C-alpha cells in the first residue's frame, strides 16, 4: 500500500531570517535545518510531492556533482524547461551548487505547435549560450530534438545524468551569476537578464522583510509559472530565503480550474498569494452560481497584484464573490517591478487594500498631468497606487528633457538600487541603452508619483501618439471590453502602425463565431464607441478566439500582436 504523502508544515521552531545570506546556496543551507519546504500539486490539485528544504538541499548537491560529471564548467549556462515539479526545483538548485547559470524557459502552450516551440527554445538556448538542456520526462522526445537542432552537448532529463563521480563543488560568492531570466520580448531575439546572487538576495530581503513583513506563521501558494520572475523569485526563491513553506500548483491547473487555487488557499490556510488582475477576474467569473461552503479565505492576508495593469472592476467583482468566504478587500497589495530589477521595486502598504487615483484622461493625454477627474466624468479612469520604493531602492519620474518631474507630472520611470541588474546577458548594446553608468535603469514604463508612491500609467513602447495626444491602448481596450456585449477582458488589443499623414490606430477584437451581419455590427459598435468616447478613428479587425498572443505571465502582448498583424497573420 502506497504511503500517504504529508505536506511540509507551516510552522517552524526557528526565528525567521529574512534572506540575510550572501548567496542563494547559503539560504538553502539554512532553510535545510528546519522542517519547512515545498509542496507540489498535480493538474487536479492533488499533492504529488512534498519536498522539505532539507531533502532539496541533499538532492541538489548530488545532482550538482552529476552535472559536473558531464563536463559542465563553472559559469556555463543550463537551459531548464520550467515544469512546476520537483525535478525543475532540484535542477535549478543543482545548478546553484555547481556554479552553473540556470536559464528557466517556458513550457509549450496548449494551442502552440511542436515545431514553433522547438524553434523558440532553440533560439533561447542559443541566446543563453547554453550547451545543456534539461526538461521534464513528458517532453523527453522534444528535448532530444531541441538538443539536436541547437547542437547541445547534453539534452535530456535528470535521470539521464551520469552517476555522482565525487566532483568538488565550487565556492559560490555574492558576485557570482545566479540565474538568467528572460524578459518578455521577441522570441526570435530574446533578451536575458543576468541576476547575481547579491541582487537576488537584496530583493528577497526587500520583499520578505519590508514588503510582506513575513511572519513565522505565513504560508505561500502560487500558480504562477516558474520561468517568469513573479513565479520564480516571488514564490520559489523568496519563500525559501525566509524559510517559508510554499505550495505550488501548475499554471495549467489554474488556467483549466482556477478555483483549485482558491480551494488550496483555504485548505492549507495560506496567507500569501499573488496573481495578475486577470487571475482574480477568472476566479470571480468561474465561481458564479456555485456554493462557497467549502472555501475559507479568512487567513489570506496578502493578496498581491502584479504582472499586468491593475484594473479595479474585476477586483471589485472578486471581493463581492468571495467576501462570504472570508476574503477581505484590505488584503489586496499592489506592487511594481520587473525582471531587470530582479522582481520588486515597490509595494503598497499592507492591510490598506487598493488605493486608486481617479484621473481626468483628457489632461493625462494632452498635458501629461495626473489631475483628479470631475465628478461624473465619462473620461475618468482609476490608477492604482503601487506604494513607495522598497528600502534602499529609488524611483524617479523624468520628463523628455531628463529632468525629474514634480509629483503628478507624468513621465518615464527610472529605477536604482541593489536589486537592479548589472547587465543583460551577452548584450552590451541593449545594456547601454537602458542602464546608465551611475546605475539608473530606464524601466520603459510611464507613470507619476503622488505622496511619494509610484503610479503606473502604461508602457512607453505601447503609447499611441495622435495629434499631440498621448493615448493609452488599455483605455481603448478596456472601454470595448466593458461596454460591448459578448466581449471579455483580454478580447481587445489596440496599437498604432505607421501611416501617412499620421499613425493609424488598429484594434483587434477576438470574435467567437457569428454570421456576417453580426460580425459587421460588432466591428461598427467598437469603432463607434472608440470614436465617441475617445475621439479615436480606429481600424477594427475581428480575429479568432485565442488569436491574441500573451506574455509568459498571461497578459496581452501588444508588440507580438502588432508584429503578427503587420506580417499578415490575421489576413487582409
Swiss-Prot record:
Q: What class of enzyme is it?
A: ligase
Swiss-Prot/TrEMBL keywords? Ligase, Lipid metabolism
A Pfam match is AMP-binding
Phenotype upon knockout is: Deletion mutant cannot form bacterial ceramide. Mutants are impaired in growth at elevated temperatures but are resistant towards the antibiotic polymyxin B.
The positions making up the signal sequence are: none
Tell me which GO cellular component terms the UniProt record holds.
plasma membrane
Q: What is its EC number?
A: 6.2.1.-
Q: Which GO terms describe its biological process?
A: fatty acid biosynthetic process; sphingolipid metabolic process
- Gene3D superfamilies from the UniProt entry: 3.30.300.30, N-terminal domain of ligase-like
Q: Does Ligase show up as a keyword for this record?
A: yes
Which pathway does it operate in?
Answer: Lipid metabolism; sphingolipid metabolism
GO MF terms on file? adenylyltransferase activity; ligase activity
Domain of life from the UniProt record: Bacteria
**Protein family membership:** Belongs to the ATP-dependent AMP-binding enzyme family.
NCBIfam families (alphabetical): PRK09192.1
The record describes the protein's role as: Involved in de novo bacterial ceramide synthesis.
Q: Write down what this protein is called.
A: Putative acyl-CoA synthetase CCNA_01223
Instruction: Give the source species.
Output: Caulobacter vibrioides (strain NA1000 / CB15N)
Amino acid at each position: 500500500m502506497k504511503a500517504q504523502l504529508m505536506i511540509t508544515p507551516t510552522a517552524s521552531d526557528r526565528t525567521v531570517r529574512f534572506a540575510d545570506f550572501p548567496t542563494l546556496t547559503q539560504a538553502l543551507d539554512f532553510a535545510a535545518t528546519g522542517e519547512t519546504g515545498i509542496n507540489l500539486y498535480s493538474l487536479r490539485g492533488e499533492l504529488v510531492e512534498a519536498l522539505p528544504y532539507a531533502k532539496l538541499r541533499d538532492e541538489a548537491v548530488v545532482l550538482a556533482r552529476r552535472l559536473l560529471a558531464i563536463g559542465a564548467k563553472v559559469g556555463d549556462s543550463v537551459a531548464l524547461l520550467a515544469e512546476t515539479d520537483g525535478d525543475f526545483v532540484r535542477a535549478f538548485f543543482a545548478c546553484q551548487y555547481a556554479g552553473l547559470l540556470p536559464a528557466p524557459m517556458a513550457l509549450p502552450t496548449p494551442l502552440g505547435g511542436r515545431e514553433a516551440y522547438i524553434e523558440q527554445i532553440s533560439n533561447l538556448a542559443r541566446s543563453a549560450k547554453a550547451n545543456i538542456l534539461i526538461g521534464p520526462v513528458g517532453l523527453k522526445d522534444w528535448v532530444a530534438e531541441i538538443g539536436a537542432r541547437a547542437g547541445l552537448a547534453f539534452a535530456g532529463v535528470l535521470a539521464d545524468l551520469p552517476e555522482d563521480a565525487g566532483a568538488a563543488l565550487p565556492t559560490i560568492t555574492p558576485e557570482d551569476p545566479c540565474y538568467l531570466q528572460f524578459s518578455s520580448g521577441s522570441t526570435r531575439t530574446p533578451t536575458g537578464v543576468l541576476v547575481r546572487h547579491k541582487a537576488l538576495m537584496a530583493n528577497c530581503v526587500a520583499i520578505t522583510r519590508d514588503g510582506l513583513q513575513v511572519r513565522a506563521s505565513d504560508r505561500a501558494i502560487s500558480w504562477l509559472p516558474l520561468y517568469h520572475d513573479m513565479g520564480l523569485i516571488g514564490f520559489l526563491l523568496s519563500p525559501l530565503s525566509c524559510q517559508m513553506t510554499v505550495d505550488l500548483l501548475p499554471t495549467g491547473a489554474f488556467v483549466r480550474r482556477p478555483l483549485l487555487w482558491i480551494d488550496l488557499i483555504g485548505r492549507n490556510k495560506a496567507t500569501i498569494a499573488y496573481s495578475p488582475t486577470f487571475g482574480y477576474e477568472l476566479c470571480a467569473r468561474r465561481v458564479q452560481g456555485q456554493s462557497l461552503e467549502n472555501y475559507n479565505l479568512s487567513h489570506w492576508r496578502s493578496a498581491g497584484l502584479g504582472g499586468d495593469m491593475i484594473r479595479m472592476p474585476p477586483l471589485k467583482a472578486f471581493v463581492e464573490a468571495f467576501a462570504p468566504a472570508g476574503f477581505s478587500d484590505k488584503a489586496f497589495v499592489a506592487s511594481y517591478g520587473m525582471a531587470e530589477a530582479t522582481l520588486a521595486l515597490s509595494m503598497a502598504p499592507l492591510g490598506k487594500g487598493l488605493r486608486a487615483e481617479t484621473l481626468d484622461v483628457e489632461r493625462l493625454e494632452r498635458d501629461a498631468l495626473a489631475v483628479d477627474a470631475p465628478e461624473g466624468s465619462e473620461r475618468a479612469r482609476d490608477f492604482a497606487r503601487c506604494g513607495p520604493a522598497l528600502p534602499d531602492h529609488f524611483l524617479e519620474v523624468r520628463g523628455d528633457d531628463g529632468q525629474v518631474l514634480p509629483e503628478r507630472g507624468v513621465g518615464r520611470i527610472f529605477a536604482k538600487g541593489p536589486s537592479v541588474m548589472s547587465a543583460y546577458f551577452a548584450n552590451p548594446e541593449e545594456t547601454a541603452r537602458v542602464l546608465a553608468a551611475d546605475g539608473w535603469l530606464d524601466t520603459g514604463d510611464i507613470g507619476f508619483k503622488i505622496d511619494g508612491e509610484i503610479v503606473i500609467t502604461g508602457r512607453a513602447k505601447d503609447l499611441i501618439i495622435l495629434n499631440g495626444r498621448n493615448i493609452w491602448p488599455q483605455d481603448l481596450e478596456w472601454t470595448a471590453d466593458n461596454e460591448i456585449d459578448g466581449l471579455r477582458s483580454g478580447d481587445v488589443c489596440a496599437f498604432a502602425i505607421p501611416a501617412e499623414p499620421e499613425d493609424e490606430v488598429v484594434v483587434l477584437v477576438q470574435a467567437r463565431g457569428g454570421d456576417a451581419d453580426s460580425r459587421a455590427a460588432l466591428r461598427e459598435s467598437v469603432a463607434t464607441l472608440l470614436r465617441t468616447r475617445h475621439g479615436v478613428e480606429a481600424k477594427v479587425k475581428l480575429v479568432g478566439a485565442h488569436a491574441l498572443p500573451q506574455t509568459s505571465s498571461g497578459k496581452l502582448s501588444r508588440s507580438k500582436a502588432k508584429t503578427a498583424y503587420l506580417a499578415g497573420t490575421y489576413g487582409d
